[in-house]
Protein backbone atom coordinates (compact mmCIF):
# COMPACT_ATOMS: atom_id res chain seq x y z
CA UNK A 1 0.00 0.00 0.00
CA UNK A 2 1.43 3.33 -1.12
CA UNK A 3 0.58 6.28 1.14
CA UNK A 4 1.29 8.65 -1.75
CA UNK A 5 -1.60 7.01 -3.63
CA UNK A 6 -4.04 5.65 -1.07
CA UNK A 7 -7.33 5.14 -2.89
CA UNK A 8 -6.32 7.97 -5.19
CA UNK A 9 -5.36 10.31 -2.33
CA UNK A 10 -1.80 11.45 -1.67
CA UNK A 11 -1.87 11.26 2.12
CA UNK A 12 1.78 12.27 2.40
CA UNK A 13 1.17 15.47 0.44
CA UNK A 14 -1.70 16.46 2.72
CA UNK A 15 0.40 15.67 5.78
CA UNK A 16 3.25 17.74 4.28
CA UNK A 17 1.04 20.82 4.06
CA UNK A 18 -0.05 20.46 7.68
CA UNK A 19 3.30 19.69 9.32
CA UNK A 20 5.04 22.62 7.61
CA UNK A 21 2.69 25.05 9.36
CA UNK A 22 3.67 23.84 12.84
CA UNK A 23 6.15 25.64 15.08
CA UNK A 24 8.25 23.96 17.77
CA UNK A 25 5.76 25.19 20.35
CA UNK A 26 2.85 23.74 18.38
CA UNK A 27 4.61 20.39 18.21
CA UNK A 28 5.48 20.23 21.89
CA UNK A 29 2.35 21.45 23.64
CA UNK A 30 -0.30 23.54 21.97
CA UNK A 31 -1.72 22.13 18.76
CA UNK A 32 -0.89 18.45 19.16
CA UNK A 33 -1.06 15.81 21.85
CA UNK A 34 2.57 15.18 22.87
CA UNK A 35 1.93 11.44 22.63
CA UNK A 36 1.77 11.83 18.85
CA UNK A 37 5.14 13.51 18.39
CA UNK A 38 6.87 10.16 17.99
CA UNK A 39 4.64 8.95 15.17
CA UNK A 40 5.04 12.32 13.46
CA UNK A 41 8.83 11.95 13.66
CA UNK A 42 8.61 8.42 12.25
CA UNK A 43 6.58 9.55 9.25
CA UNK A 44 8.71 12.62 8.44
CA UNK A 45 11.90 10.58 8.75
CA UNK A 46 10.55 7.85 6.46
CA UNK A 47 9.28 10.32 3.83
CA UNK A 48 12.10 12.85 4.22
CA UNK A 49 12.77 12.80 0.45
CA UNK A 50 9.13 13.67 -0.22
CA UNK A 51 8.20 16.11 2.53
CA UNK A 52 9.11 19.77 2.03
CA UNK A 53 11.83 21.21 4.28
CA UNK A 54 12.15 17.81 5.94
CA UNK A 55 15.51 18.59 7.59
CA UNK A 56 14.02 21.64 9.29
CA UNK A 57 10.87 19.76 10.26
CA UNK A 58 12.93 16.94 11.80
CA UNK A 59 15.05 19.47 13.69
CA UNK A 60 11.89 21.16 14.98
CA UNK A 61 10.47 17.82 16.11
CA UNK A 62 13.68 17.08 18.00
CA UNK A 63 13.54 20.53 19.63
CA UNK A 64 9.91 19.93 20.57
CA UNK A 65 10.81 16.56 22.10
CA UNK A 66 13.48 18.13 24.29
CA UNK A 67 11.19 21.04 25.19
CA UNK A 68 8.57 18.55 26.35
CA UNK A 69 10.98 17.08 28.90
CA UNK A 70 11.04 18.39 32.46
CA UNK A 71 14.11 20.22 33.69
CA UNK A 72 14.73 17.61 36.39
CA UNK A 73 15.41 14.97 33.73
CA UNK A 74 12.45 12.73 34.52
CA UNK A 75 11.30 12.66 30.91
CA UNK A 76 8.16 13.76 29.11
CA UNK A 77 5.92 16.26 30.88
CA UNK A 78 2.28 15.47 30.19
CA UNK A 79 0.49 16.77 33.27
CA UNK A 80 3.57 15.63 35.16
CA UNK A 81 6.03 12.82 34.57
CA UNK A 82 4.93 9.22 34.14
CA UNK A 83 6.01 5.80 33.02
CA UNK A 84 3.33 5.94 30.34
CA UNK A 85 4.54 9.17 28.73
CA UNK A 86 8.18 8.09 28.59
CA UNK A 87 7.27 4.72 27.12
CA UNK A 88 4.85 6.13 24.60
CA UNK A 89 7.14 8.84 23.20
CA UNK A 90 10.83 7.94 23.43
CA UNK A 91 10.91 4.59 21.54
CA UNK A 92 10.05 6.39 18.29
CA UNK A 93 13.36 8.27 18.49
CA UNK A 94 15.65 5.25 18.70
CA UNK A 95 17.33 6.17 15.41
CA UNK A 96 18.72 9.30 17.09
CA UNK A 97 19.98 7.64 20.26
CA UNK A 98 23.45 6.74 18.97
CA UNK A 99 23.96 9.89 16.90
CA UNK A 100 22.44 12.75 18.89
CA UNK A 101 23.90 13.45 22.33
CA UNK A 102 20.94 15.60 23.41
CA UNK A 103 18.42 12.85 22.69
CA UNK A 104 20.65 10.23 24.33
CA UNK A 105 20.93 12.35 27.47
CA UNK A 106 17.15 12.80 27.62
CA UNK A 107 16.52 9.08 27.12
CA UNK A 108 19.08 7.97 29.71
CA UNK A 109 17.74 10.44 32.24
CA UNK A 110 14.16 9.31 31.62
CA UNK A 111 15.28 5.71 32.07
CA UNK A 112 16.57 6.53 35.55
CA UNK A 113 13.08 7.78 36.36
CA UNK A 114 11.04 5.03 34.72
CA UNK A 115 12.97 2.13 36.24
CA UNK A 116 11.92 3.38 39.68
CA UNK A 117 8.31 2.55 38.82
CA UNK A 118 9.05 -1.18 38.34
CA UNK A 119 7.59 -3.17 41.23
CA UNK A 120 8.92 -6.37 42.77
CA UNK A 121 6.47 -8.52 40.77
CA UNK A 122 7.74 -7.09 37.47
CA UNK A 123 4.73 -4.89 36.78
CA UNK A 124 5.05 -1.11 36.56
CA UNK A 125 3.18 1.70 38.24
CA UNK A 126 2.04 4.94 36.67
CA UNK A 127 4.70 7.18 38.20
CA UNK A 128 7.20 7.54 41.01
CA UNK A 129 4.59 9.58 42.86
CA UNK A 130 1.90 6.93 42.27
CA UNK A 131 3.82 3.64 41.98
CA UNK A 132 0.96 1.31 42.82
CA UNK A 133 -0.91 -0.54 41.64
CA UNK A 134 1.11 -2.09 38.86
CA UNK A 135 -1.16 -1.77 35.84
CA UNK A 136 -1.46 -2.98 32.27
CA UNK A 137 -0.87 0.36 30.55
CA UNK A 138 2.22 1.38 32.49
CA UNK A 139 3.67 -2.14 32.31
CA UNK A 140 3.27 -2.16 28.53
CA UNK A 141 4.82 1.27 28.15
CA UNK A 142 7.77 0.43 30.39
CA UNK A 143 8.41 -2.74 28.40
CA UNK A 144 8.35 -0.73 25.16
CA UNK A 145 10.83 1.77 26.62
CA UNK A 146 13.33 -0.69 28.07
CA UNK A 147 13.09 -3.17 25.20
CA UNK A 148 14.11 -0.34 22.89
CA UNK A 149 16.74 1.17 25.19
CA UNK A 150 18.57 -1.65 26.92
CA UNK A 151 19.36 -0.88 30.55
CA UNK A 152 21.62 -3.05 32.74
CA UNK A 153 19.32 -2.58 35.72
CA UNK A 154 16.17 -3.79 33.97
CA UNK A 155 15.37 -7.37 32.96
CA UNK A 156 12.92 -6.99 30.10
CA UNK A 157 12.03 -10.71 30.18
CA UNK A 158 10.62 -10.16 33.68
CA UNK A 159 8.60 -7.18 32.44
CA UNK A 160 7.26 -9.21 29.52
CA UNK A 161 6.27 -12.19 31.67
CA UNK A 162 4.52 -9.96 34.19
CA UNK A 163 2.27 -8.53 31.47
CA UNK A 164 1.36 -11.91 29.97
CA UNK A 165 0.88 -13.66 33.31
CA UNK A 166 -0.97 -10.93 35.18
CA UNK A 167 -2.89 -8.88 32.64
CA UNK A 168 -3.77 -11.12 29.70
CA UNK A 169 -7.49 -11.84 29.46
CA UNK A 170 -8.43 -15.32 30.65
CA UNK A 171 -10.66 -15.74 27.60
CA UNK A 172 -7.54 -16.16 25.49
CA UNK A 173 -8.63 -13.87 22.66
CA UNK A 174 -5.50 -11.71 22.77
CA UNK A 175 -7.07 -8.98 24.86
CA UNK A 176 -5.65 -7.46 28.01
CA UNK A 177 -7.56 -6.23 31.02
CA UNK A 178 -8.05 -2.84 32.56
CA UNK A 179 -6.32 -3.22 35.92
CA UNK A 180 -8.85 -1.05 37.70
CA UNK A 181 -12.02 -2.70 36.37
CA UNK A 182 -10.79 -6.23 35.73
CA UNK A 183 -12.54 -6.14 32.34
CA UNK A 184 -11.13 -6.54 28.85
CA UNK A 185 -10.09 -3.15 27.52
CA UNK A 186 -9.58 -2.78 23.78
CA UNK A 187 -9.38 1.01 23.87
CA UNK A 188 -6.35 1.51 26.08
CA UNK A 189 -4.97 -1.45 28.02
CA UNK A 190 -4.74 -3.89 25.10
CA UNK A 191 -3.00 -1.45 22.69
CA UNK A 192 -0.52 -0.41 25.40
CA UNK A 193 0.26 -4.00 26.36
CA UNK A 194 0.70 -5.05 22.73
CA UNK A 195 2.92 -2.06 21.97
CA UNK A 196 5.28 -3.21 24.68
CA UNK A 197 5.13 -6.86 23.68
CA UNK A 198 5.69 -6.18 19.97
CA UNK A 199 8.68 -3.96 20.70
CA UNK A 200 10.15 -6.63 22.97
CA UNK A 201 9.68 -9.42 20.42
CA UNK A 202 11.25 -7.30 17.69
CA UNK A 203 14.38 -6.83 19.77
CA UNK A 204 14.58 -10.56 20.48
CA UNK A 205 14.50 -11.24 16.73
CA UNK A 206 17.16 -8.61 16.06
CA UNK A 207 14.83 -6.50 13.92
CA UNK A 208 14.83 -2.73 13.64
CA UNK A 209 12.42 -1.10 16.01
CA UNK A 210 8.77 -1.38 14.91
CA UNK A 211 8.32 2.39 14.83
CA UNK A 212 10.93 2.95 12.11
CA UNK A 213 9.14 2.45 8.79
CA UNK A 214 11.93 3.94 6.65
CA UNK A 215 12.93 0.66 4.99
CA UNK A 216 9.32 -0.28 4.30
CA UNK A 217 8.54 3.06 2.68
CA UNK A 218 11.65 2.72 0.51
CA UNK A 219 10.62 -0.78 -0.56
CA UNK A 220 7.19 0.48 -1.58
CA UNK A 221 8.72 3.35 -3.58
CA UNK A 222 11.28 1.07 -5.24
CA UNK A 223 8.57 -1.38 -6.28
CA UNK A 224 6.46 1.46 -7.64
CA UNK A 225 9.33 2.90 -9.66
CA UNK A 226 10.76 -0.38 -10.94
CA UNK A 227 10.76 -0.57 -14.76
CA UNK A 228 8.19 -2.94 -16.20
CA UNK A 229 9.68 -5.47 -18.56
CA UNK A 230 7.68 -5.64 -21.75
CA UNK A 231 6.87 -9.15 -22.98
CA UNK A 232 8.64 -10.18 -26.16
CA UNK A 233 6.58 -10.18 -29.35
CA UNK A 234 9.04 -12.49 -31.13
CA UNK A 235 7.96 -16.12 -31.55
CA UNK A 236 10.00 -18.56 -29.50
CA UNK A 237 12.33 -20.87 -31.38
CA UNK A 238 12.92 -23.12 -28.38
CA UNK A 239 10.81 -26.26 -27.97
CA UNK A 240 8.51 -26.14 -24.98
CA UNK A 241 9.58 -28.14 -21.94
CA UNK A 242 6.36 -27.49 -20.03
CA UNK A 243 4.06 -30.48 -19.45
CA UNK A 244 0.62 -30.38 -20.97
CA UNK A 245 -1.96 -28.79 -18.70
CA UNK A 246 -5.27 -30.35 -17.80
CA UNK A 247 -8.47 -28.41 -18.45
CA UNK A 248 -9.60 -26.32 -15.51
CA UNK A 249 -12.38 -27.78 -13.39
CA UNK A 250 -12.96 -24.54 -11.53
CA UNK A 251 -12.24 -26.27 -8.23
CA UNK A 252 -8.51 -25.60 -7.94
CA UNK A 253 -7.09 -23.93 -4.86
CA UNK A 254 -5.05 -20.83 -5.68
CA UNK A 255 -1.43 -20.97 -4.52
CA UNK A 256 -0.18 -18.53 -1.89
CA UNK A 257 0.67 -15.22 -3.51
CA UNK A 258 2.96 -13.73 -0.90
CA UNK A 259 4.03 -13.46 2.68
CA UNK A 260 1.04 -12.31 4.71
CA UNK A 261 3.25 -10.91 7.44
CA UNK A 262 5.11 -8.70 4.98
CA UNK A 263 1.84 -7.51 3.46
CA UNK A 264 0.41 -6.65 6.86
CA UNK A 265 3.53 -4.77 7.87
CA UNK A 266 3.42 -2.66 4.73
CA UNK A 267 -0.23 -1.97 5.48
CA UNK A 268 0.75 -0.77 8.95
CA UNK A 269 3.44 1.43 7.42
CA UNK A 270 0.84 3.21 5.31
CA UNK A 271 -1.52 3.44 8.27
CA UNK A 272 1.22 5.07 10.33
CA UNK A 273 1.37 7.90 7.83
CA UNK A 274 -2.41 8.19 7.74
CA UNK A 275 -2.69 8.14 11.54
CA UNK A 276 -0.15 10.88 12.00
CA UNK A 277 -1.81 12.95 9.32
CA UNK A 278 -5.27 12.93 10.77
CA UNK A 279 -4.36 13.34 14.43
CA UNK A 280 -2.13 16.40 14.34
Regions found by a protein language model. Give the residues of each.
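Intrinsic disorder/low-structure terminal segments
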Residues: 5, 21, 46, 96, ...
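Hydrophilic extracytoplasmic domains
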Residues: 163-181, 187, 197-218, 229-230
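An alpha-helical repeat/solenoid feature that recognizes helix-turn-helix modules
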Residues: 1-7, 25-57, 71-106, 120-157, ...
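Juxtamembrane interface at the cytosolic side of transmembrane helices
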Residues: 279-280
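Extended, well-ordered alpha-helical scaffold segments
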Residues: 4-26, 50-72, 99-118, 151-170, ...
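Intrinsically disordered, low-complexity repeat and linker tracts
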Residues: 205-274
Amino acid sequence: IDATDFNGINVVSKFDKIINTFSVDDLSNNSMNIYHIGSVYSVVNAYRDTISNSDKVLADIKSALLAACTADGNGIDNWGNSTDSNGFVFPFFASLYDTDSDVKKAVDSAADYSKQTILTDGTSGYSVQYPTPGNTNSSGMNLAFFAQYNNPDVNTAVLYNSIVNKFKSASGNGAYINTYTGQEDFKSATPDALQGIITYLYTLEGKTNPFDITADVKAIADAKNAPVEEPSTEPSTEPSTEPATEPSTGNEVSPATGDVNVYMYLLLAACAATFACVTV
